[in-house]
Amino acid sequence: LLTWKLWKENRKNNGSLTYISFENAPLSKKDIERVYKKFKKLDGYSRFLLKNIPERYKSTHRIFIKADNINLILIYDDITSLINFNFKADTWFLDGFSPKKNPLVWTDKLFKQLYNFTNLDGSLSTFSVAGHVRRGLLKAGFKVSKVNGYGNKKEITYAIKKDSIISRI
């Protein structure tokens, strides 16, 4: 919802936004509604999404938000299905859970796929600051750093894809 709000506030002329979300265990409509109630300032956005949220079955679902030229793509499958798609991302928001809780997300193979699916100067962020996550992102080719977090999170991991001789090999 915040991405949508920021897009709407900062959109240039006829710009378009494609937001792709991989959801291995999508929340029920009831649970989403309960979460959204805590964010009153985003009420208009949440009402639209709740009205249009797809059923929870494994598939690729699309919601077009015509007024703001946003194509929301909800992939109800785990992130390892990324290999079946063809796109380049400017930004990734990764699972913030501990690698022990969601090991599928934190593999060298997936880090390399994320790198290959990221535009030059594209970024990635996650609440996970585990050493093997940072090392895996580095090994994949990202420039990685720990940056100040917010709320109860002291630090987060931030990575960016920069051009280098290694990335062109």
Predicted segments — roles?
Residues 129-140:
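Short alpha-helix
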Residues 1-53:
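SAM cofactor-binding core of SAM-dependent methyltransferases
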Residues 33-86:
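S-adenosyl-L-methionine
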Residues 140-169:
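Core SAM-dependent methyltransferase catalytic element
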